[in-house]
Amino acid sequence: MAKRSRSSGRWLAEHFSDEYVRLAQEKGYRSRAVFKLMELDEHDRLFAPGTTVIDLGAAPGGWSQYAARRVGASGRVLALDMLPMEPLPGVTVVQGDFLDDAVFHAMLEAIGGRRVDVVLSDMAPNMSGNRNVDQPRSMYLAELAFDLAERVLGPKGSFVVKLFQGEGFQEYVARARKAFGSVGMRKPKASRARSAEIYLVGKGYRGADR
């Protein structure tokens, strides 16, 4: 049997002692990450009944699950990921890469061609542990999420995206400030203490060409 690395052993110990893991299990959520979105929503009021939401990098589905509960039967939640994801009540799942035209059009069809109210992206690359590699990869995914948001968001729409500070960060924030009426940076309590992640929340979408 292969030996566990010190880092994987530390992760397991942290995971099983994590209060948010326990709470997610108690409340029937698929991941502890749901509490990050919950806190962002409480602060920024992202969802309302009837809201249309796209969740990028959705698997295993915690964020989509929470969003579906918030938008209700009159809303729509589309979960998109390259990984397979088990079905969830009130959530339409599309598997694939949204850079693929066929996948993008399947996504638009799933939401009835309507403009989107909220785009969520908790996407992250497979982490190598090397910040000089991981941060640029994360920024690339964030850029892709922003590009998609600009294609699908309706007026006054909202955008939530995971970022890691480093190369390209300030330029990204500047781009967001041009596209949204308000931009805030959030570090949810549910983010692990050792994580450098931060969330950008843009509200009041006003278009890409301002």
UniProtKB/Swiss-Prot annotation:
It is found in: Cytoplasm. Gene3D superfamilies: Vaccinia Virus protein VP39. One of its GO terms (molecular function) is rRNA (uridine-2'-O-)-methyltransferase activity. It comes from the Bacteria. Transmembrane segments: none annotated. The keyword Repeat does not apply. Its main location: cytoplasm. Keywords: Cytoplasm, Methyltransferase, rRNA processing, S-adenosyl-L-methionine, Transferase. GO terms for cellular component: cytoplasm. S-adenosyl-L-methionine binds at G61, W63, D81, D97, D122. It catalyses: uridine(2552) in 23S rRNA + S-adenosyl-L-methionine = 2'-O-methyluridine(2552) in 23S rRNA + S-adenosyl-L-homocysteine + H(+). It holds the Pfam family FtsJ. The keyword Cytoplasm applies. Its EC number is 2.1.1.166. The active site is at K162. Belongs to the class I-like SAM-binding methyltransferase superfamily. RNA methyltransferase RlmE family. Specifically methylates the uridine in position 2552 of 23S rRNA at the 2'-O position of the ribose in the fully assembled 50S ribosomal subunit. NCBIfam families: PRK11188.1. PANTHER family: RIBOSOMAL RNA METHYLTRANSFERASE, RRNA METHYLTRANSFERASE 2, MITOCHONDRIAL. This is Ribosomal RNA large subunit methyltransferase E.
